């Protein structure tokens, strides 16, 4: 039997994976949908490419801004909680040790062992112990706004670049069908891959992402076709 210390689980990477896949999916769906809508309105190839480029830039900036603000708010909350915990340790160190002891008792340790663990951990790193076991914070899980913003913008841009590249290279008569096929295949692969890495059902994950992507493309194509007819 393999030692427990060597067991590997997928939970650690689920957060960043979800954010990356979400950004790429957004890039593919929003940009391909916009390009299809513009193309369905029978506009020029130049306008199609300009619309796709604008969608890539605007979407990436929007994702970066939203992610930065959101994660920075989380970082501010974490910093405030740590500052409060630091102040409480300075005022009532013994009380904080009792609080940590109670946490370990609730987790299943007997009182004597819980006291020993709390005393040793607080002697080594009092604030870190409370941050981890009371607040649920660790160095690995701390919010990093700039990193999150860059990752979100990068994943969106990577996804958006795919339909834009197809639009630039595909012959005009086959532009729409080429974008649909490439985008749906990409969504199918992304959905299945993220489900597999996350330990979920691959088929269900792939089909779910592909279905909603197809729905978005169909809706914007319909709007573009109607606009082209009315124009």
Q: Which residue ranges define each predicted feature?
A:
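Transmembrane alpha-helical segments and their cytosolic interface motifs
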Residues: 16-34, 139-166
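Interfacial loop-to-transmembrane junctions
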Residues: 189-214
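The feature identifies polytopic integral membrane transport proteins across all domains of life
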Residues: 12-23, 45-53, 113, 144-150, ...
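Structural signature of hydrophobic alpha-helical transmembrane segments
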Residues: 173-185
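Cytosol/matrix-facing amphipathic helices and coiled-coil assembly/linker segments
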Residues: 1-18, 71-153
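Alpha-helical transmembrane segments of multipass membrane proteins
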Residues: 58, 62, 159, 163, ...
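Juxtamembrane boundary at the C-terminal end of a transmembrane helix
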Residues: 221-231
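Internal alpha-helical transmembrane segments
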Residues: 1-70
């Amino acid at each position: 039997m393999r030692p427990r210390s060597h067991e590997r689980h997928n939970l650690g990477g689920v957060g960043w994976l979800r954010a990356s896949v979400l950004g790429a999916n957004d890039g593919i769906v929003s940009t391909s949908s916009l390009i299809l809508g513009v193309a369905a309105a029978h506009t020029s190839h130049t306008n199609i490419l300009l619309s796709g480029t604008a969608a890539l830039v605007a979407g990436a900036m929007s994702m970066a801004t939203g992610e930065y603000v959101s994660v920075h708010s989380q970082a501010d909350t974490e910093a405030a909680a740590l500052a409060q915990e630091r102040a409480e340790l300075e005022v009532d160190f013994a009380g904080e040790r009792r609080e940590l002891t109670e946490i370990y008792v609730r987790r299943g340790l007997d009182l004597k062992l819980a006291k020993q663990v709390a005393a040793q951990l607080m002697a080594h790193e009092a604030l870190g112990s409370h941050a981890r076991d009371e607040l649920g914070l660790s160095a690995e899980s701390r919010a990093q706004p700039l990193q999150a913003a860059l990752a979100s913008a990068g994943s969106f841009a990577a996804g958006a670049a795919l339909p834009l590249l197809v639009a630039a290279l595909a012959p005009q008569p086959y532009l729409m069908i080429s974008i649909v096929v490439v985008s749906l295949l990409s969504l199918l692969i992304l959905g299945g891959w993220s489900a597999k890495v996350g330990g979920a059902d691959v088929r269900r994950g792939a089909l779910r992402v592909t279905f909603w992507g197809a729905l978005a493309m169909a809706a914007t194509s319909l709007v573009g076709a109607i606009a082209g007819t009315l124009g």
